[in-house]
Amino acid sequence: MQWGHCGVKSASCSWMPSLSFLSVWLILSFSLPYCLGSPSQDGYWSFFSEWFAPRFSVRALPFTLPNYRRSYESLLPNCRPDVPQFAFKHPLGILWHMRVSHLIDEMVSRRIYQTMEHSGQAAWKYVVGEATLTKLSKLDIVTHFQHLAAVEADSCRFLSSRLVMLKNLAVGNVSLQYNTTLDRVELIFPTPGTRPKLTDFRQWLISVHASIFSSVASSVTLFIVLWLRIPALRYVFGFHWPTATHHSS
């Protein structure tokens, strides 16, 4: 919903709720690109769409980031073996952002109309006033949705940090399976011999240094050979060496 300017004195205050709602929109819009890549419909995060349903957001629960991480760890055993397929479904539900925005708009609009009904026509000229807008911006439901948006942005960063690993697993046709006996998630490779070979970091570093040294040494050797075999190359770089003169008798 939109509010107009409320005059010269309170022109700056008339945009306070809209800035509050704009921050929610920005958080939700910027968290979308990080969550576009996702597994298939019955994949790892299919339960997140139900877990982030609006019925949980309507209840103003004490939702903190440590509680969210503990909840995520408790939901980790629900992972089912599946081959990752990306860009098919939003891990938190593609309609979740629309639901949040509609709920914010609906709750604030309902509170405004309740104020109008109780205060009568005299409240219309104070609707865009500083006091009314300050009360609206300090509503518990607005603060709660802002907190939910921050939690969702954090969860999107948490999931997007693992998208590279899952994408690499998808290239190798690797699946995930939760082992109830060992209480951990295991990788399932298509064949026993396709397990990737891990290279030691020191060996990798030595090979990189050896490659750099060999390339530099080969280039220096080639330059010396050309310097000795092509005399004109010396004059290109400005070296005019004296040559031996033979005196004829």
UniProtKB/Swiss-Prot annotation:
Q: How does it sit in the membrane?
A: Single-pass type I membrane protein
Annotated InterPro entries: Arteri_GP2a
Keyword Transmembrane helix listed? The answer is yes
- Residue ranges of the TM segments: 208-228
- From which residue to which does the signal peptide run? 1-35
Give a Gene Ontology cellular component term annotated to this protein: host cell endoplasmic reticulum membrane
GO biological process per UniProt: symbiont entry into host cell; virion attachment to host cell
Q: Which UniProt keywords apply?
A: Glycoprotein, Host endoplasmic reticulum, Host Golgi apparatus, Host membrane, Host-virus interaction, Membrane, Secreted, Signal, Transmembrane, Transmembrane helix, Viral attachment to host cell, Viral envelope protein, Virion, Virus entry into host cell
Subcellular location(s): the record lists: Virion membrane; Host endoplasmic reticulum membrane; Host Golgi apparatus membrane; Secreted
Q: What is its main location?
A: virion
Sites carrying sugar chains: 173, 179
Virion surface face residues? 36-207
Pfam (any one) = PRRSV_Env
Q: Which residues lie on this side of the membrane: Intravirion?
A: 229-249
- Tell me the function of this protein: Minor envelope protein. Along with GP4, serves as the viral attachment protein responsible for mediating interactions with CD163 thereby playing a role in virus entry into susceptible host cells.
Subunit: Heterotrimer of GP2a, GP3, and GP4. The GP2a-GP3-GP4 complex associates with the E protein. Interacts with host CD163; this interaction plays a role in virus entry into host cell.
Query: Under which name does UniProt file this protein?
Result: Glycoprotein 2a
> Source species, please?
Porcine reproductive and respiratory syndrome virus (isolate Pig/United States/SD 01-08/2001)
Q: What gene is this protein a product of? A: GP2a
